[in-house]
Amino acid sequence: MKTSKKRPAKNKLPQDLATFRDRYVELFGMLPALPAARFEFSGDINPEFLALSERLRAHAFYSDVFDVKITQLILFGMLLVEHHPAAQMHAIAARRAGASWEELHKVAELASVTGSLAPANQGSAILKDVRDKESSV
């Protein structure tokens, strides 16, 4: 039988991890399912890794460069381009941080243009390269 170091009681997180968890509730108005599972499981199995990953997240999400609204708009667009379901949670967080429907829609417009023009840009570059090689022989 494998023994492991003593862990905190289930759902009892150290204060630093509880503070990180509470930031999700501030942003989203709730603790989303994926972070909730991460806090429960990683908090039990490897709280050090959870703390490291949450410090990395906090460093990126909360800065003196972008305010919370802009950060959430950027994350919404990035996740939208990736077709990631978490885009919805970041749209909610952006609204809670003061984003207008127009701002969110503009981000969706930018994401759709980025996604649809990428094949046109790449295709044109490939075809130009092929044409240039053909004309040089």
Describe the predicted segments one by one.
Residues M1-I70, Q122-V137:
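Acidic, glycine/proline-rich low-complexity segments that act as flexible tails and inter-domain linkers
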Residues I45-R55, P85-A97:
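Acidic-glycine-rich active-site phosphate/pyrophosphate-binding loop
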Residues S53, I70-T71, A87, L104:
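N-terminal alpha-helical segment
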Residues F66-D67, G98-E102:
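Helix N-cap / loop-to-helix initiation motif
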Residues I70-P85:
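Amphipathic, charged-and-aliphatic alpha-helical interface segments
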Residues A87-S100, I126-V137:
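Short alpha-helical "patches" and their helix-cap loops
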Residues H105-E109:
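Beta-strand segments within the central parallel beta-sheet cores of soluble alpha/beta enzyme folds
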Residues L117:
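Substrate/cofactor-recognition hotspot
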